[in-house]
Each structure stands twice: as structure tokens, then as C-alpha cells.
Amino acid sequence: MPYTDVMDRYRGLRAVSTHHHSAALGCLARQAILEQAKHLGLAYGQTLVAESEEEMTLLFDLAIYTAKRGRSRAIDRYAKSVMLQPGSDEALTLDAMCQARFSLWRIERRHETAGVIVADLLRDRETWLLDQGLAHSANPGMTVASRLCWPAEFAMTRGVIVPVYVELIEDAFSDSTAWLSHADPQRLADDPRFAAAIYRNAIQTGIMENVVYREPAVAD
């Protein structure tokens, strides 16, 4: 597929996913947001104390895509509340968002058409990732924590990209030993406490101060 066709497809799906993401926020109760904020150290009593949009992005990622055992996720509640045409971009994208995966991703190389090829370090597989900001700034060997979804033949981020390094990952593991019983790395990646620990340590180390999230431009 030519570059222009790929990017047009990406921008269209990105716009759809942004709409779904905003709508899913409406399925969140304030208490649920506050609980996640406490996990990240972004709450003082009943008050949110996030200092940047980037910190709020981490908070909303956890609030939308994770939930306590026995509770439903906001993204799933939203999906059940809407009627979409089967096979439409809206339906395909929402289904992909419901199946989004968190992991540690290493930039392997540039994709021949657009974006990059990344390796899932916890599931031992590669995928084609389209993200304009990351494609312009990432170098091979760089590792990021992110939640990806696959609405097409390529993956997209769910808005969160956290640069990680060995010390931050080690701190995340020492943050809690609750998931160390997971012998299977995939179960570790699927455990919402792992994402929370990565995000919490990213905030505490100040790494999020150097991260800016931007939606892709409508046209080059």
C-alpha cells in the first residue's frame, strides 16, 4: 500500500479511536478516577494533584482500560452502550481498543512504508506500529511502555508512550512483588498492576516532564 494511502487510513482510524476514547471517559465515575490517581500518587485525599496533561493521560489510560477484579472496565461498558455497524471503521476500532495490550516495546527498525517495527519484549513477537510522533523521534533500540491496539494491519498507541530504561523497570518490579509469581511474561504484561507500577515510577522519576503527546496532523 502506498505511503499516502497508509497515512490516510491511519489518520482516519486515529480520529475514530480518539472519539471512542473521549466517549469512554464519560463512563468513568469520579471515585474510579480517584482510586487510580491514588495508585499513581496523583491524589491528595479526595483531590487530584496531577501536574501535567501527560500525567493525566497515564491516569485515564488506567481508568479506561483496567479495573479491579470483579468490576467491568470503562471501555467495555462504553462498547456495550453503543450500536455500531458491523465491519465499519467505528466497530473495528472499538473492538480493537477493547483488546488493546500493554507491554514494553523496543524499536527495532523503520517500516518500509511508514512507522516502525517494534518488538513486544514480554510476548516475544514483532508488530508494525504507526505513530507519527514516535516515528519521528524514536531510534532503534529505544524501549517504551505503551498500550497498543490493532484496528488494521498496523498497530496504534492508545495515547500513552512512556520511555523506559533498565532502572525504571527494576524500580517497577521492586515497587510490588504481587506479580512476581507470574512465570509467564504474558501474564505479567496483562496484569494491570504492572502498567500502574511503570506509570507510577515514570511520574516519580520525572521522566514524564520530557514527554509531550500530540495527535497527528490532518495532513502533511
Descriptions of predicted regions:
Residues 1-113, 125, 136-137, 143-220:
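Mixed-charge, low-complexity intrinsically disordered regions
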Residues 114-118:
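Short aromatic-glycine-enriched beta-strand elements
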Residues 120-129:
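Short, structured beta-strand/loop micro-motifs enriched in basic residues and often containing a Trp
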Residues 130-132, 141:
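Short beta-alpha junctions and helix-cap segments that line functional grooves
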